[in-house]
Amino acid sequence: MEKRIVCLAGDGVGPEVMESAKEVLHMVERLYGHHFHLQDEYFGGVAIDLTGQPLPQRTLAACLASDAVLLGAVGGPRWDSAKERPEKGLLALRKGLGVFANVRPVTVESATAHLSPLKNADEIDFVVVRELTGGIYFSYPKERTEEVATDTLTYHRHEIERIVSYAFQLANKRKKKVTSIDKANVLESSKLWRTVTEEVALRYPNVEVEHILVDAAAMELIRNPGRFDVIVTENLFGDILSDEASVLAGSLGMLPSASHAEKGPSLYEPIHGSAPDIAGKNKANPIAMMRSVAMMLGQSFGLTREGYAIEEAVSAVLKSGKCTADIGGTETTTSFTKAVIQEMEEQALVGRGR
C-alpha cells in the first residue's frame, strides 16, 4: 500500500513525538511492505514565526491533498501575546478539512493502571465521540457589551444525525452500546438531540442506547466508567467530558485521538498539549503519538493488523517495566521509541516463525 501523510510537528514537544511517529511508520513499511510518503509542513506557532499565520495556505493545501494528517502539538506561552494565536490554526485546520467527529478512545494499560485515580482502572475501555461543527462554539449571534454577553447554541437535525450515526456504526463494531449525553431537561437543542438519537437507534436494533444528562454523566465517568462503550455528545459537553475522561489513563501522554470528515483526509493527534516545560529535553511520552499512528493505519487505511502490532508493542514494552518519567520511569522519548520498534520487529519474527 502507498499513502501520503502530511506531518504537522507543530510546537513544544510536537517535533519530538512526531519523530517517534515517523520511526514507527518506517518500521511498518519495512515489516509489511507498505510505502508512506511523509510530507512535513509548518503549523501552529512555528508557522506564525515563519509566515505570520498559524495555518499557511500551503499547509492546508497539502493536508487536503493527503490521505491522512498527523499533528504533534500546538501552542505555547511564547505566543500568548501574539496577534495570531497558534490554536486558531487548529480551528482553521478542522474547518478546512471538514472534520465533524472527534474520536477519543479511553483505555488503561494494566502495567500503568496504578497511576489512574480510580481503582480497577484496567477495566476501562470506552470511546468518546464529540460533535465538532455545531453547538455554542459556532452558533450566532454572539454579542458582548459592558453589561451583557450572549452566546447562541444551535444544532441542525443533519448535524445530529451525522454524528449519532457515526457513533452507532462504531458501537456496532465494539460492545454494541451507545450512551447519548445531553441536557434535554432544560435545553431545546438537547431535546432535538434526543429525538434524533432515538430515530437513528431504530436503524441499529442490535445496539443498546441510553440517554444520560450531562451532569449525571460527569459523575458516572468517575463512579462507574465501566458502564460505557461509545459515548456521543455535542460540542461543548464533549469538550469537557473528553478532558475529564482523559485523566483516567493516569497521564495525558497515553491517549490518541482522531477527527473524521465525511470525505477526505482525517486528522490524528495525541490529546496532550505542547508541554513547553520539557520541550527539547527528550522527556516527552511518545505513546499517545504512536497510538495516533495506529488509529490512522486502522481507520483511514484499513491496516488493522499493522495498527494492532503497534498497540501490542507498546503494551509489551510497558509490561517490561520501561516507561517515561510522566508514568514513573526513566526512559527518554528516543529510548522508549527504540524499545517499541524493537518489540514490533521481534513480534513480527515470532509471527512469521509460526
Curated annotation (Swiss-Prot):
Entry-linked PROSITE patterns: IDH_IMDH (PS00470)
InterPro entries, A to Z: IsoCit/isopropylmalate_DH_CS, IsoPropMal-DH-like_dom, Isopropylmalate_DH
Location in or out of the cell: Cytoplasm
Taxonomic superkingdom: Bacteria
Site entry (Important for catalysis), positions: Y137, K183
A GO molecular function held by the record: magnesium ion binding
Cofactor, free-text remark: Binds 1 Mg(2+) or Mn(2+) ion per subunit.
Residues the record lists as binding substrate: R94, R104, R130, D215
GO cellular component term, pick one: cytosol
Binding residues for Mg(2+): D215, D239, D243
Pathway, per record: Amino-acid biosynthesis; L-leucine biosynthesis; L-leucine from 3-methyl-2-oxobutanoate: step 3/4
Required cofactor(s): Mg(2+); Mn(2+)
Residue numbers binding NAD(+): 76-87, 273-285
Keyword Aminoacyl-tRNA synthetase: no
Single biological process term from Gene Ontology: L-leucine biosynthetic process
Any matching Pfam family: Iso_dh
SMART domains: Iso_dh
Keyword Oxidoreductase: yes
EC number from the UniProt entry: 1.1.1.85
Keywords: Amino-acid biosynthesis, Branched-chain amino acid biosynthesis, Cytoplasm, Leucine biosynthesis, Magnesium, Manganese, Metal-binding, NAD, Oxidoreductase
Function: Catalyzes the oxidation of 3-carboxy-2-hydroxy-4-methylpentanoate (3-isopropylmalate) to 3-carboxy-4-methyl-2-oxopentanoate. The product decarboxylates to 4-methyl-2 oxopentanoate.
HAMAP family linked to this entry: LeuB_type1
PANTHER family named in the record: 3-ISOPROPYLMALATE DEHYDROGENASE (PTHR42979:SF1)
Similarity remark: Belongs to the isocitrate and isopropylmalate dehydrogenases family. LeuB type 1 subfamily.
Quaternary structure annotation from Swiss-Prot or TrEMBL: Homodimer.
Protein name, UniProt field: 3-isopropylmalate dehydrogenase
